[in-house]
Each structure stands twice: as C-alpha cells, then as structure tokens.
Amino acid sequence: MIEIERNILIILGNGISIDLIKKLQRETDINLSNLFVNGDKVLWPANGEPGFLSQQRCPALWELGARPGIKEAKANKIIEDIITCANVSASSEHPTIDGESSNIYIKAYHELVLYLRYLFIYYNNEIKTEELQCVINDKWGWSELFKRLNTDEGCKSVTIITYNYDIFLERILGVLGIEYQMIGFKDNEAKFKILKPHGSISFRTNNLGNKQAFGIKYNRDSIGGELGELIVDEEVRFDKISKLNTMIPPSGESDRYKQSCSSVLREKSKQCAQKLMEEDEVIFGGLSYCNVDRREVDGIITSLNVNTNIKIVNPDSENTLGAVISSVFKNYIHYTESDILGGLFND
C-alpha cells in the first residue's frame, strides 16, 4: 500500500471558538457572538476596575448605543456601522482615521479596537487549562483532528490560518503537547504552523507601556507597526500594556488600513495557499465569510489549486462561502458538525 503524503491548510473563523465554548457549556459568560453583552465585566488596565465598556471609558461607543446586555443584532449593527465608516475613511484621500477626528464613528473605531483586545483577554482568563483538558478528554472533533495530523507520518505539514483574536487554538495545541511555529515571528521546524493575519491578543510590543498612563488614543499612533516591533506573549494579562494594537476588528478590510504587520501576514497567507498541490487538503472551519475581510479570503481561494480537496465545517450547509467554494472547486465536501473531524484522514 502506497502511503499518501499531503500538506494540510486549515482556515479558521470565529465558529471554531464558538464550538469550543459550546462544548465547555460556557456560552453565556463567554459570548463570542455578541461582543458588547459582557463589556461591563472587562477590566480597565490602569486600575483593574471592571467597566471597560462604559460612558466613562468609551464615550463614543456608548453614545452610539453600545451597552452591556444589549441584543446581538443591535451589537452587530453598531460594529458594522463603525467598521464601514472606518473602512471608507482609511481608503479616502484625506483619511480621518489617521489623526484626531471629531467624527463619532472614527472615535468609536479607536475605542472598539482596544476594547476588543481586553474583552478577549478577559475571556481567555476565564477559561482554565483544566477545562480545555476536559474537552480534549471528551474527544472534541477539532482536538481529535489535530492529534491525528500530528502523529500521521503521511501528513507533511499543517498550516492554520486563523482570523480569531483569541488564543484558544494555541492553548489546545499546548495541552495536546503539539509544538507549533507562529508565522512571521521566530522560525522553527515545527510541523504545525499558525498564521494570524488579523492579529491576536498574544501579539504585543517588546517594550511594555505604562499601566498607570493607559488610555485610548484617538489617532493612528497606537495602531499598526512593524512585525519586528512585536513579540508573541501567550501569558496574556490585562496589565501587560502593548504600545501598539495590531488587531483588526470584525469586517475590517485589512488592506485599507496600511498596517505593515497586517499586510505582511496577509501576503504570507496567500503564499501558503499557492504552495498547495492537487493531493493536498484545505479545511475551512467556522468561517462565516461575512465577518472577516471577504476580499482577503477571496485572495486565498483564488490562490489555491483548483484540483485541491476542499472541506468546509459549518452548521449552515447553504452559506455563502459554500456557494463560492462549489463554484470554484469540484472536490468539495461539507460537514455540519465538528465531531466528524476525528475520523478524517484514515487512509
């Protein structure tokens, strides 16, 4: 029997984290669909007081209606309006997002990008390692897949492009004892490689900022930066102040913002796709296609070999991404549940 050798590319969206939280039965206190609902619990780094999302700390977001406890649809509409305005501003000839602006949506954008960082740091600290171990012991589909690929000698490499800010993926791999490389940072020969084009709560400047002087800057100075200025620190704590925030909010069109680190990582994601051959596999997991940069995902799709094997894991088998994939690739399979993943690649 000839052993099949393949490279695996996995592209992940918010759905995998939602699936994990559902498995943990923590959907209420770790709500990844409504990003404002738990905003009053998020700590303000300067003094550790809960209430990051408040009139005092985020006046522009508050004026636009962002409140702890609001409904998901309203929260998503507020974020969509803010990011749409920021996208247009970032690509205009006189971008107000680059400097001080009196526009409430641009002010809200600067509040949002920083609030999201500390929201996900708060969520990360709420999930204990013992809980992740229980999920693995319970044979969660994604963890079973990672274990199989790690021990499969026919699998040459596993590259994971994730648009999630959280580090639940990295922590799961850590509990599994799987070594990985964070692309764009220190190189190593790990079989597993992770690429985060939209940033991460684990990315921070090497030199920390002054915690007591923490505040929201309403200009470009706190956004972007070169990759060389950043390190990966998975001991994410709210009192470790990064001088730059590299995270791009949901639906933020990354190529408009001219962030050096984001553009480099975005280009690397295309390169990962271009390297794949016919015998290789691509898995899209929990990617809505609406809450990420659609043009960025299209760039990955159009970089793939049309004969590559494509799998999608998403509860909605009639979603837009599936329609796009089926129009481009003939070798396409859709799974509605992650439980099936542990049984893949048994050949």
Region locations from a protein language model:
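Acidic, metal/cofactor-coordinating or nucleic-acid-engaging core segments within structured domains
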Residues: P50, R220-M277
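Short secondary-structure boundary/capping segments
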Residues: K23-L35, G174-Y180, Q212, G299-I300
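Short, surface-exposed amphipathic charged segments that create phosphate/polyanion-binding patches used
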Residues: K193-S200, L208-I216, F345-D347
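Short, flexible loop segments at boundaries between secondary-structure elements
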Residues: W44, K186-F203, T308-I325
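A short secondary-structure junction signal
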Residues: E170-V175, T205-K211, R295-E296
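Metabolite-binding pocket within alpha/beta catalytic cores that recognizes anionic/polar moieties
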Residues: L20, Q133-I194, S202
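Gly/serine-rich nucleotide phosphate-binding loop at the start of the catalytic core
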Residues: M1-K156
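SIR2/sirtuin-family catalytic core signature
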Residues: M1-L20, D29, F52, Q259, ...
